[in-house]
Design a protein with these regions (language model features):
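Acidic, glycine-rich loop-and-beta core segments that form the ion-binding/anion-interacting portion
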Residues: 202-251
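A helix-coil-helix interface module used to build multimeric assemblies
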Residues: 1-188, 193-200
């Protein structure tokens, strides 16, 4: 059952987001009077050391002990600064909100990378279409020559598809980039923690206002996957056209 319940070998991908969220949480608990300045400083510096271990590839996962990325980071923090102070990090926080926060931050960060790649790709398409506007080629329907077209016209037909993908991606990112931190297990936080401050520190654009929905919903993951399927459908068409056009019969 221990091995069955472990998710550390999957959610360790969230290590940076988990640590950033924990630092923001500790800062908010310090502001709320739960942690002293010295305790917050120790927790912050300890978590920064844990992040350096992950970055250097020296963090040691302990099978059977580190159930998930949250327990792994907190276990290591306690080893570095002592369990008495390290154990205070989790005061008032639930892993329900913690994993939802990690997932949203990680997904947002990865989608923004794709956003950059897709924007660059669109610029290349536009530049090539402008440069090669005088190239003429056969236009095909059902693999039969139908009408003469410009190479740039073909290029920009995919440019429109990818531009729509980019627009939809930005809409997905906007819905992903909302903070559940401070929502507790399902009914909020009893210590009047500053959710706005934490959201701003972690780069969220706003808050999820219903605590039960915030910690239980995973529709943002499904929406990102749906978007990715649409993008790959366009990429597949693009690739298939290029494969077909490499044969002399089609040029």
């Amino acid at each position: 059952m221990v091995s069955y319940n472990e998710s550390i070998y999957y959610d360790r991908a969230f290590h940076s987001q988990d640590i950033a969220g924990s630092i923001a949480w500790a800062r908010a608990n310090h502001k709320g009077g739960i942690l002293s300045a010295a305790e917050f400083s120790a927790i912050e510096s300890g978590l920064e050391k844990v992040e350096k271990e992950w970055a250097a590839g020296t963090f040691k996962i302990i099978p059977g002990v580190d159930e998930d990325i949250h327990t792994a980071n907190e276990r290591r923090l306690g080893e570095l600064i002592g369990k008495e102070i390290g154990g205070k990090l989790h005061t008032g926080r639930s892993r329900n909100e913690q994993v939802a926060t990690d997932m949203r931050m990680w997904l947002r960060d990865e989608l923004r990378k794709i956003e950059t790649y897709l924007s660059d790709f669109l610029r290349v398409i536009a530049a090539r279409a402008e440069k090669e506007v005088d190239y003429v080629m056969p236009g095909y329907t059902h693999l039969q020559r139908a009408q003469p077209i410009r190479w740039s016209h073909w290029m920009l037909s995919y440019g429109m598809a990818f531009a729509s993908d980019l627009e939809r991606l930005r809409e997905v990112i906007a819905r992903v980039n909302l903070s559940p931190l401070g929502c507790g297990a399902l009914a909020g936080n009893p210590f009047n923690i500053d959710r706005q401050m934490m959201a701003k520190e972690l780069g969220f654009e706003g808050l999820l206002w219903n605590s039960m929905a915030a910690v239980s919903s995973r529709d943002f993951v499904v929406e990102a996957l749906q978007w990715g399927a649409t993008l790959m459908g366009h990429m597949s068409r693009w690739a298939e056209d290029l494969i077909i056009y490499r044969y002399f019969l089609f040029l």
